[in-house]
Amino acid sequence: MKKTNEKKIANKCQIFTPTNYVKELLDSVGYHKNIVNKTILENSCGDGNILVEIVNRYIEEAIELKFSNKKIKKGLENNIFGFEIDKNQFEKCICNLNLLVKKNGIQDVEWKIYNEDYLKSEVNIQFDFIVGNPPYITYSNLSQEERTFIKDKYETCRQGKFDYCYAFIEHSIKSLSSEGKMSYLIPSSIFKTVFGNKLREFMVKYIVEIKDYTKEKIFDNALVKSAIIIVDKKDCSEKIKYINMSNDDGLYICKKTIRKKWVFSNEFNIGKKRFGDYFKVSHVVATLLNKAYVINEDMYDEADEYYKVGKFMIEKDVIMPTATPRNMRYGKEEKIIFPYKYIDNQLIKYTEKEFKNLYPGAFSYLTKFKEDLIKRKSDKKSKWFEYGRTQALLGIKCEKLLISTIITDKVAVYRLDEACIPYAGMYISLRDEHQEYNFGFAKEILESENFMEYVKKVGINISGSSLRITSKDIEEFNF
């Protein structure tokens, strides 16, 4: 079982650091001068593209200092460390390092490169430098065994759905000497995601600089943007230097005033009234299998009391209008099978027998997807023909606004009536029907330049110029 888990992790770690970012990582901690007697670690080294640059810099300085090849060899063996969990990448790494030193007339180096999981290693050294690009594996892609191990060992991962790299960051900072420095290329979502809060609390006192690649796509297949964090154990600065690498804009952020979500701006959200005090922002329904419930306009023909979908006659009484921000944008209409009913605004669930008897057409249609519906990770009390998540159903029967969780260039807000059951985005409802601010005002606020500027600061950078926001982000906006 252990080997299987390690292989799965290894397969998910095969993203290597481009050369220009390798140099930026090393330059950021000053690994270019006075380095021959300093220890350095790369703890997820892949085929060695960072280690090759490290060794090259080491040899260059050693030659300048007139070191003999024998002395250089000894220095390489005593000062440069690496870990790589994948056997094939480990062997490539050793091969690449041997080719490099051979060009300089050095052979038979006994490298301190280990073919093992850094998080489970018993190597106990305090390093002068740690540089790297830790493996980025989401919580959902970790085995239960790995989740349990990491939760038990790392304080930043005790709660919530942590990412694998959180443990690497914690372990690395703890492995630095009292004057050690670290530079790590990390997903910039770490600064803002809710599950990264404990990690941010842990590392804020050590971070001295952040280089944020807000526009650049460093890794071809990665959805999130990246940043370099720079740690200096001996620097007790009360501020973090922040640089937006897309335009070289920089500022200093006071550590004492930094919030749970790290926002890199000294002028931020300065309005007097909180949006969430007047409007509630909620998640829409989650069917967990949209293809079973959603019927687009090209799929059906309308009859008196039915929608004909293929050979199925689905009863109109069990069909509701639906919407997504994307379909609203392009003017597309869709319907959704709604296997519930409301009586006096209370959600009523059917038994399987009731639903089959009342709506045999809809029941037969859903039965076509029964195998996939059963496989969903649904709420424990959800029946196979119901939506996977039911929480949103308790408050969604109301007039509302619809907004996307992904914002690109501008915010678009759509007005929906009480009957509409959206299945993507977030919906906004009134806190009080008699309050001074209505939906028209809310739409105006959310489509304003001020809100867009706010989104640019609180949103998580993903592909292109797109940003991901949460319901809490919207509620916390001050106008």
Task: List PLM regions with ranges.
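C-terminal substrate-recognition regions of SAM-dependent nucleic acid methyltransferases
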Residues: 8, 12, 217, 227-401, ...
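Short, ligand-facing micro-motifs at secondary-structure edges
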Residues: 211-212, 404-421, 453-462
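Conserved SAM-binding motif I beta-strand of class I
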Residues: 80-84
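A short beta-sheet element
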Residues: 409-444
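Conserved SAM-binding loop
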Residues: 93-94
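Short helix-loop-beta connector
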Residues: 32-39
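Signature of N6-adenine DNA methyltransferases within the class I
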Residues: 10-11, 15-24, 38, 44-52, ...
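Conserved SAM-binding strand-loop segment of SAM-dependent methyltransferases
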Residues: 106-117
